């Protein structure tokens, strides 16, 4: 390719960047392709036109183009290797089919080699020598017009792509081939004697070896048209001569390339026709069956299709039936409940029944059967509740003082349970509260006079009129006067029945007999006998005085007897304890006397003073000591007088009484 006619738009962005960097052209880091193309036209193309720097610029451009071509070839070989590895794992083909595929590969490789050899034979000898000396240099396109160079490169790439497509088709084709394909007619191609000798060698080696796709891809990549650049720096005259030679070569090669392309298209058409024939033959063989097997196969397929069609229908039918059963299990109880509720209301209480409507419809005789079945479940009439006034449709009105009550299970009238009459608890509570207030007032009034013991009824009690005025003015605001009057009548009746309430009419005879009231407006006086609110002082004065007068004599006698018994008991206890102490002291005194008698180193006697001090040292009271010693001495002399010798001893002018134990 002539670098002066190079179109930078055909290059990639990475290639343009590399060319600009190698030619020391600065550009922005985020520059896009139009900016890079503009810089190439302004900077690099000027250097191509100048003679001293043209070789360097061409060298950089050739490196970039060659690296791009190598990358493209490497990608193609990798793709072919991947396709071959995937196809080799999935293939299980017979020996006959393997041989046909080998022959097909041989034909494609020979066609490709022939085409490449034709182009090499037409190239000058000088370039072949340069290829042998420097095979690693990037190819240089022959100098020609822009349109001719693009056409030749496009033809070569299209031919290589057709060959690769044929290889891919063979590797991905899993259909066995019955007939061998005809070999391409190589004599139609114009080749040299050297190329024919090389081709025969490769065909001989292909008969013994099994080509894989990796070898095929390397062979295809190795057969390329490579153009070499000059070894050293060339002058302007040499470049012009070289470009003229390359133009002549391209003009000579073009007809040969066209012929090779036509041959390749013919070969691909023959391959396609042969594949179609093979597939049609195989399908015809597979379809040829015996009439019995064909009918069995037809019947089996038909039954299978029928089962496949019936399966979803049966599943949908089962789902529909299941949903229908659930719907009926819900709707039937609801309809029966609505019918029963209507019948219950229509029947109502006994003596107030209403005529029932029949469910039978003349147009549908089946409804008569349903109506006859439901008549067995028709409810019976209910008895009217106590203290109630019944009417139709289960309506109830209660007597005065009672109110209608509904059942807990009625659920706001959805289920028609009968009502009953109960006492009006609100009125009863109001009456009870008013009775309690009046009773407490009378108790306090009674406790305020003579500690509840007064005999004057007007001081300890209250008249009916005054009680009415007091509690009428203190009634709650929401209670009317009429309601209070009704409640007051009940309050007076309840007060008269209480045990701690005394009530007397104001117009009574002196002898205590009550006169018959001349009118219904007789006024009464009420008094409470309860002492609940009497003070503590009144309780003490009255109760204690009463107890003393009633139980005083017997109480004093009881206390005297108890005191006497206690005194006697204490005296006896003291006597017993004194006797026990004296017995103990007597025994200790005798033991002391015996010990002194036995001890020969000392005097064999003890004075009464020594003996008293030894025995009564624990008792601090002198009076008690004297008392105990006197009793002890008296008891010793009375019981042990025969065993004790008593004599007087004078010492230092004092006379002492001495006791000595006789053995």
From Swiss-Prot:
Kindly report the protein's main subcellular placement as a broad class: nucleus
Does Secreted count among this protein's keywords? no
Q: Give the record's keywords alphabetically.
A: Membrane, Nucleus, Phosphoprotein, Transmembrane, Transmembrane helix
One short Pfam name that applies is: HeH
Could you tell me where the Polar residues compositional bias lies?
47-62
Q: Does the keyword Phosphoprotein apply?
A: yes
Chain intervals with Basic residues compositional bias: 124-134
Recorded hits in CDD domains, A to Z, give: LEM_like
Q: Which residues cross the membrane?
A: 317-337
The UniProt entry annotates the motif Nuclear localization signal at: 124-137
Subunit structure and binding partners: Interacts with SRP1.
Q: What name does the UniProt record give this protein? A: Inner nuclear membrane protein HEH2
| Organism, as annotated | Saccharomyces cerevisiae (strain ATCC 204508 / S288c)
Lineage here is: Eukaryota, Fungi, Dikarya, Ascomycota, Saccharomycotina
């Amino acid at each position: 390719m002539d670098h002066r006619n190079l179109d930078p738009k055909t290059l990639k962005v990475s290639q343009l960047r590399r060319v600009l960097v190698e030619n020391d052209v600065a550009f922005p880091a985020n520059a896009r392709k139009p900016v890079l193309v503009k810089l190439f036209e302004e900077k690099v193309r000027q250097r191509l036109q100048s003679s001293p720097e043209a070789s360097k610029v061409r060298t950089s451009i050739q490196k970039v183009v060659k690296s791009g071509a190598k990358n493209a070839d490497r990608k193609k070989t990798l793709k072919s290797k991947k396709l071959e590895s995937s196809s080799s794992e999935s293939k299980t083909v017979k020996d006959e089919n393997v041989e046909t595929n080998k022959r097909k590969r041989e034909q494609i490789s020979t066609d490709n080699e022939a085409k490449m050899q034709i182009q090499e034979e037409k190239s000058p000898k000088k370039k072949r020598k340069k290829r042998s000396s420097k095979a690693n240099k990037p190819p240089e396109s022959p100098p020609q017009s822009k349109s001719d160079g693009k056409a030749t490169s496009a033809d070569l790439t299209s031919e290589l792509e057709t060959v690769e497509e044929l290889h891919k088709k063979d590797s991905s084709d899993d259909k066995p081939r019955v007939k061998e394909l005809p070999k391409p007619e190589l004599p139609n191609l114009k080749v040299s004697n050297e190329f024919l000798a090389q081709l025969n060698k490769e065909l001989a080696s292909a008969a013994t070896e099994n080509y894989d796709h990796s070898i095929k891809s390397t062979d295809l990549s190795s057969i390329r048209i490579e153009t070499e650049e000059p070894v050293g720096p060339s002058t302007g005259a040499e470049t012009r001569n070289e470009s003229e030679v390359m133009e002549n070569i391209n003009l000579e090669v073009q007809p040969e390339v066209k012929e090779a392309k036509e041959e390749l298209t013919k070969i691909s058409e023959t391959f396609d026709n042969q594949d179609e024939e093979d597939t049609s033959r195989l399908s015809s063989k597979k379809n040829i069956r015996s009439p019995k097997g064909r009918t069995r196969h037809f019947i089996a397929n038909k039954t299978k299709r029928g089962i496949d069609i019936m399966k979803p229908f049966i599943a949908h039918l089962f789902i529909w039936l299941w949903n229908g059963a659930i719907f009926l299990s819900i709707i039937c109880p609801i309809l029966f409940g609505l019918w029963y509720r209507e019948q219950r209301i229509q029947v109502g209480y006994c003596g107030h029944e209403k005529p029932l409507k029949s469910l039978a419809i003349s147009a549908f005789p089946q409804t008569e059967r349903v109506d006859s079945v439901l008549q067995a479940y028709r409810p019976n009439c209910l008895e009217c509740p106590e203290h109630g006034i019944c009417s139709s449709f289960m309506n109830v009105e209660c007597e005065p003082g009672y109110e209608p009550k509904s059942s807990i299970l009625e659920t706001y009238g959805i289920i028609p349970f009968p009502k009953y009459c109960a006492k009006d608890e609100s009125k009863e509570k109001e009456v009870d509260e008013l009775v309690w207030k009046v009773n407490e007032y009378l108790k306090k009034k009674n406790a305020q006079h003579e500690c509840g013991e007064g005999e004057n009824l007007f001081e300890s009690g209250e008249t009916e009129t005054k009680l009415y005025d007091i509690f009428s003015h203190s009634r709650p605001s929401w209670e009317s006067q009429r309601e209070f009057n009704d409640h007051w009548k009940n309050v007076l009746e309840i007060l008269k029945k209480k045990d701690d309430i005394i009530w007397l009419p104001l117009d009574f005879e002196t002898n205590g007999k009550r006169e018959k009231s001349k009118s219904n407006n007789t006024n009464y006086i009420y008094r409470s006998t309860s002492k609940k609110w009497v003070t503590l002082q009144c309780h003490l004065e009255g109760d204690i005085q009463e107890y003393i007068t009633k139980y005083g004599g017997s109480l004093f006698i009881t206390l005297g007897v108890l005191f006497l018994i206690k005194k006697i008991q204490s005296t006896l206890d003291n006597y017993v304890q004194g006797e026990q102490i004296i017995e103990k002291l007597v025994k200790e005194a005798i033991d002391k006397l015996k010990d002194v008698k036995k001890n020969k180193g000392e005097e064999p006697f003890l004075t009464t003073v020594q003996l008293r001090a030894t025995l009564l040292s624990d008792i601090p009271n002198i009076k008690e000591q004297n008392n105990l010693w006197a009793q002890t001495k008296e008891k010793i002399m009375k019981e042990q007088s025969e065993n004790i010798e008593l004599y007087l001893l004078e010492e230092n002018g004092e006379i002492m009484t001495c006791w000595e134990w006789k053995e």
